[in-house]
């Protein structure tokens, strides 16, 4: 497993972990972080930080999955369209601006109405044993509504895009090497990826940066 911590300034850190959950978070910045955490829906993350915003890119993908697998239902498309509208409204804000309270209230009312629609549709078309993701998503979106819509109230990102980009790059690399033979190999890859990504974020020449790293003299033994 690879744990990725990314900041709004574009910096990131990758950690090799044998386990998910609290054991995977131990020793990472998240363990002591007190700010707002932007994350996918892993309930473990709710034990850390002071506030939470679920990554809406994940939610949009899950909604698309429901649309593809449950074409007889309408709630998922309505919710996807609403989320796109909310994101567009936030993107249109100028620096220091915030959404009007009435606009936010309208978004939240429509969110509730769509979740009520989902309840009615699943009563009429119960989820099958082969696909329950849409049903579970609707229940989850109601239970974690505050974390889903925090970005309407506060200046927080609505997606963890930096972590997503790094994760995609790392997954492509894993496909190339097939598998890491040891945790040590995965740890080395995480350290190297952390260094390279942060050099790029700072606008540094990656080749020169890595050359400086390898040119360092190891400290003398104590």
Indicate where each model-derived feature is located.
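Catalytic center-proximal scaffold of phosphoryl-transfer enzymes
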Residues: 1-222
